[in-house]
Amino acid sequence: MIIAVTGTPGVGKTTVSKLLAEKLGYEYVSLRDYAIEKGIGEMKGDELEVEVDELTYNFERDFKGKNVVVDGHLSHFLNADLVVVLRAHPRLIGERLTERGYSREKVGENVEAELVDVILVEALEENENVIEVDTTGKTPEEVVNEILELIEKGVKKRVGVVDWSEVYDEVIPYLRL
């Protein structure tokens, strides 16, 4: 089973993915590291720009039929059995990305993406089996337990659990206005 864990930068994908893989006994794959290792895409500053079709082709060739948890904000474009879209309060995203040294423009871009569900919409356009999990105020263990519970119950689709439309005023300082 291929489980893709995706979401806006700063939601906790890597931490949750590694823990989920450990609890399931699956291999953990960082999509970014995989792309670099395979020579897919090119670095532009600190960012890796990849051709999504080439990435998905190579990933499917190398991992089809294997049990993996793959982490990356493009992982929802893969042919996965389940896509987990992690969400976090946009203010929290802004704080985390600012701490990581992201430019004001990049922080604003990602806060806005979280605010208007960009990754969730993309995931739903690409996949049937999508579950959305709000990580706000939860430990990585709590998030992983929620995901495992949904998997054990056979839940293949759960969306609409997050609505940030009421928090717009809180995140204005992070937006590119």
UniProtKB/Swiss-Prot annotation:
Chain residue ranges for the region called LID: 99-109
Domain of life of the organism encoding this protein: Archaea
Keywords noted in UniProt: ATP-binding, Kinase, Nucleotide-binding, Ribosome biogenesis, rRNA processing, Transferase
Stretches that traverse the bilayer: none
NMP: annotated span: 30-50
MF-aspect GO terms: adenylate kinase activity; ATP binding; ATP hydrolysis activity
Pfam families the UniProt entry points to: AAA_18
UniProt binding sites for ATP: G10, G12, K13, T14, T15, R100, K138
EC numbers, comma separated: 2.7.4.3
Keyword Nucleotide-binding: yes
GO biological process, one term: rRNA processing
Reactions accelerated catalytically: AMP + ATP = 2 ADP; ATP + H2O = ADP + phosphate + H(+)
Quaternary structure and interacting proteins, as annotated: Interacts with uS11. Not a structural component of 40S pre-ribosomes, but transiently interacts with them by binding to uS11.
Summary of the function given for this chain in its UniProt record: Broad-specificity nucleoside monophosphate (NMP) kinase that catalyzes the reversible transfer of the terminal phosphate group between nucleoside triphosphates and monophosphates. Also has ATPase activity. Involved in the late maturation steps of the 30S ribosomal particles, specifically 16S rRNA maturation. While NMP activity is not required for ribosome maturation, ATPase activity is. Associates transiently with small ribosomal subunit protein uS11. ATP hydrolysis breaks the interaction with uS11.
Similarity field: Belongs to the adenylate kinase family. AK6 subfamily.
Protein name per Swiss-Prot or TrEMBL: Putative adenylate kinase
Species: Thermococcus gammatolerans (strain DSM 15229 / JCM 11827 / EJ3)
